[in-house]
Amino acid sequence: MTQLSTKILWLFVATLGAICFGYLALQNGESVSAIYLVVAAVCIYMIGYRFYGRFVAYKVLELDKNRATPALVENDGRDFVPTNKAVLFGHHFAAIAGAGPLVGPILAAQMGYLPSMLWILVGGVLAGAVHDFVVLFISTRRKGRSLGEMIKDEMGKFTGGVAMVAIFGIMLIIIAILAMVVVKALAESPWGLFTIAMTIPIAIFMGIYMRFIRPGRVGEASIIGFVLLILAIHYGSVIAADPYWAKIFTLEAPTLAIVMMAYGFIASVLPVWFLLAPRDYLSTFLKIGVIVVMAVAIVLVAPDLQMPKANTQYFDGTGPVFAGGVFPFLFITIACGAISGFHALISSGTTPKMLENETHALAVGYGSMLAESAVAIMALICACILHPGLYFAINSSSALIGTDVVNVAQTISSWGFSITPEEITTLTANIGEHTILSRTGGAPTFAIGVALILHELFGGVDLMAFWYHFAILFEALFILTAVDAGTRACRFMVQDILGNVYKPLGDIHNYPAGLLATALSVAGWGYFLYQGAIDPKGGIYTLWPLFGVSNQMLAGMALLLATTILVKMGKARYTWVTLVPAVCVLVATLYGGIQKIMPYEEGNKVANAVSHVAAVSIQSQKIKDLEFKLNNTKDEKEISTIKKEISIATQNKVGNLLNAILCVFFMIATLLVIISCIGICLGKIKIPLKETKYIKIDEFQKI
């Protein structure tokens, strides 16, 4: 292709994207086809990767194809393993793409499609992808060191020490939440559990095939693995229909929680080429395959975006799906769909230890985040093609809308979104569920959206239930890969912390030390997971509200670290690349964090619903009222009921108090990183650059 034709092609892509983007932003009144959103997103991602991604890669970071990576220098066949670019892309994408891009945009859709679309597209290209890419780069230049360890090396021991503890706490919360989503999806689901279980032996076979049987034959292993995965999905439905096998593969949530912990431990201590990398690569086939099929199906089916462009009546935070104003909580709620701190832990965890060539970081780091942003766009479409009345029926709590279909329809219609009981019951029957009312959390909405789109092309109404349950399975597989990779990254983090106490424990090549660190990691997130599995109001459910804020604070810290390193590298003129998104993320997140620790304010329902401190006051008063009531009744049945209510209120009080304390601690850690960044950038704090010595790649031969 000639230079002129290339320029014409990119001009066409840019023009097409701008037209579709502008149409979505400016259209008023009439419904808009989802095709415009798909086309706008694809064009923006193409432009972002080709121009901005390459600018960051070769102007800002100056990637060097001749520089040896830690995977080559430290190759130990377990954690440090040079990995094919396509396989590593699959591993990294599977590891970072958890519940966030599926759930966040669906919840944020209550504000309308335009605010979410703007942040997912702009934030994904200019903030999230840059964040992932730059952290992967700086970790690769530092022997694959973890985020906390790099903050300690580059920004000071005290700041780094506090940050390491905060990052570890955030990591435990994130992994436990991801694991709980998987447990909820697979509990009582023999089809899903069988299919997920089968990906393990398939991945092990692929790992052995690519390393010993046919070294380097990634294409062959990919075809075999993909065929076996499709067979596993098919026979999962056969297993579910068989009474004997269905019973074997039907597990309750507490049992599944234990299985998840065992799997997380084993996957984290085995050599990365044996299970983790091939399984993530295999999962990526399904993940990207479903997203591509969804995009094509949307173009063919052309569903309308029925959600209004902007639900301005909920911008003040009074929306029924989540409390909090459009600023800052839209950004915090969307989270991973635009930028995620969890990605920094993977980009400084497993991935830099597997990067075969430094130039691969562009595709692996920047490209993977754009792929995740595309997932977020698909999730947003799944929510917005629903009738708004159905959307709110699914995502509003039963305490707000009730449980009777007629009353639910009346309540939601009174909000201005007309819906009939028949529309609710018809959809419920079509997807084979008992009810769709108050199926909060985002996952059911995504599955319904997938079913509504795909049944138009494959099978009609008769197969809507199949596509719905397939989407639930897809979500479980989508999220599980983030759990095993997250646990491995958490192990590196624990070893960094233990290494400050006893140096041999910090050696990641030390197998016994790795086993101890993995056990501590799994015990940490596993405790919260198991408690949540046996008590729907305990364990990780207590810490769930902290996910969004803590995750975004982590992203802000990572971007400030990157800014500091750019200054030390003599690239201060390029610091806007990381500093601008850091400021945007931290202003929104710290403002949200402050709102979460504000005291109770009489008559301010939105502020009180957001604040953990206000919730503590509300629950304390509730406990006092219940205790007074308890002391003035003699009815045994009523006494039992009141005691139960006191127990629940006490649990809520303790949970919110813990959230408030952790929120303050995370903000303090973030402020320390901000202060250190400012001090270093202004030359007030002198800490030398800790980049590893340059070693030419031709000194090593891939093992």
Write out the residue ranges for each language-model feature.
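Membrane-interface helix-loop-helix modules in multi-pass membrane proteins
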Residues: 22-28, 32-33, 79-142, 153-157, ...
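Loop-to-transmembrane helix boundary motifs in multi-pass membrane proteins
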Residues: 154-172, 367-374, 440-442, 461-471, ...
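Transmembrane helix-loop junctions in multi-pass membrane proteins
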Residues: 18-31, 100-102, 114, 172-188, ...
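Extracellular/periplasmic helix-exit of transmembrane alpha-helices
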Residues: 298-314, 370-448, 485, 530-538
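Membrane-interface loop-to-helix entry segments
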Residues: 35-42, 47, 51-60, 166, ...
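Extracellular loop-to-transmembrane helix junctions
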Residues: 31-50, 108-139, 148, 193-199, ...
